[in-house]
């Protein structure tokens, strides 16, 4: 099995890391590098009142935000500008994969990838409507230069007493390595962190079940669980239910265990949001043991 080497980094707006695949088996070998990112797009709604339950009325010209074409275009520009800065010296064409959340529909992603700041990357869109009460979904953008799409499935979280986002599992080939990307936006902390924790634990259990079902069919497939998890790496949903480890060595060579590179990022005082003068790192990318090699990045 080809291994992918990961180096972790955190952005204020996204969780992201880079992966590299050896081009040959020699020492001092050259590698191919691709970036993987997650970005909560924070209520990316169009201006059209097209939800039959009126869940999008807030983001319409007549709604409380007076969400008109100018504001929508400005938001698209700002998001595209931020994404355009996801490039590095080794990934000049941007990330291979960008998981996203808080989007109203597919059309807003089509509008986003058409923005001049990132249109040259030729990003493709993967999206599926969810039953979420606010009318927001998850999605995925990918660059066909790096990633070849094979299959997409959607998984409903039925173990909670409300409508929330589906989990989307995107399977394909990244730098020749077969991978599955499970894009998430887990239930919020409304009602309190402790009181709402069972909802996120249920979401984590669903992600774990999806991964296990993939491995029953293909034991060598690499799995990435990414998203706005509304929990930190050390919280029960991530550390206990998923069993995502802080240190690669704690996997003890288990190809189907999970490693969370963002745990150490949070330990360094870096987060993706702050609340009551304390950083949280809800936006994470968690990877399976068969996508790791060597020591902690």
Question: What are the functions of these language-model segments?
Answer:
Residues 19-116, 126-138:
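N-terminal, active-site-proximal structural segment of metallo-dependent hydrolase catalytic domains
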Residues 1-4:
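Positively charged n-region of N-terminal signal peptides that target proteins for export
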